[in-house]
Amino acid sequence: MQLYTYLYLLVPLVTFHLILGTGTLDHGDALTERRSTDATALKPEPVLLQKSSARSTNDNGKDTQMKRILKKRGNKARGEEELAEKAPEFARELAN
């Protein structure tokens, strides 16, 4: 009876020791290699952040392009040239 009790307790301990100690499962697949390849396969590729040429910001993250545009326009909401260019479009929209 004592032999069966020792085997009952010993077999799971030996099994877990072999699995965790050697890092292998059945068919000799290594746990550590599989995890590392799976982890690298799931990692997204690094995205290179580039500042858009349309927007430029200062060190505080404020939009400096809008500042320049407003300064050039004289702090008007829209430039006179821009209104003159879009006048036919506005007229068409109002007519519809």
From Swiss-Prot:
Comp. bias (Basic and acidic residues): 77-96
Free-text description of this protein's post-translational modifications in UniProt: Hydroxylation of Pro-88 is important for NR2B/GRIN2B NMDA receptor selectivity. Removal of hydroxylation does not change global NMDA receptor antagonism (tested on WT neurons), but it decreases the inhibitory potency on NR2B/GRIN2B NMDA receptors and increases the inhibitory potency on NR2A/GRIN2A NMDA receptors. Hydroxylation of Pro-88 locally disrupts a small region of the divalent cation-induced alpha-helix but does not destabilize the entire helix.
Modified positions (4-hydroxyproline) in chain numbering: P88
Residues annotated as binding a divalent metal cation: E81, E85, E89, E93
Positions carrying Asparagine amide: N96
InterPro entries membership: Conantokin_CS
Site-annotated residues for Important for activity (Pro and hydroxyPro): P88
Cofactor: how bound: Divalent cations stabilize the toxin the in alpha-helix conformation.
4-carboxyglutamate modification, residue list: E81, E82, E85, E89, E93
Site positions for Important for selectivity: K86
GO molecular function, one term: metal ion binding
Tissues showing expression: Expressed by the venom duct.
Renumbered residue ranges of the record's region Disordered: 51-96
Signal peptide span: 1-21
Prosegment location in residue numbers: 22-78
PROSITE patterns associated with the record: CONANTOKIN (PS60025)
Consequence when changing E93K: No change in activity
Domain of life: Eukaryota
Cofactor dependency: Ca(2+); Mg(2+)
Key words of the record: Amidation, Calcium, Gamma-carboxyglutamic acid, Hydroxylation, Ion channel impairing toxin, Ionotropic glutamate receptor inhibitor, Magnesium, Metal-binding, Neurotoxin, Postsynaptic neurotoxin, Secreted, Signal, Toxin
Gene Ontology terms: cellular component: extracellular region; host cell postsynaptic membrane
Places the protein is found: Secreted
Annotated function: Conantokins inhibit N-methyl-D-aspartate (NMDA) receptors. This toxin has antagonist activity on the NR2B/GRIN2B subunit (IC(50)=0.1 uM). In vivo, when delivered into the brain, is active has anticonvulsant activity in the model of epilepsy in mice.
Miscellaneous note of the record: The mature peptide does not contain cysteine residue.
Family: Belongs to the conotoxin B superfamily.
Protein's UniProt name: Conantokin Rl-B
Species of the source: Conus rolani
Organism taxonomic ancestry: Eukaryota, Metazoa, Spiralia, Lophotrochozoa, Mollusca
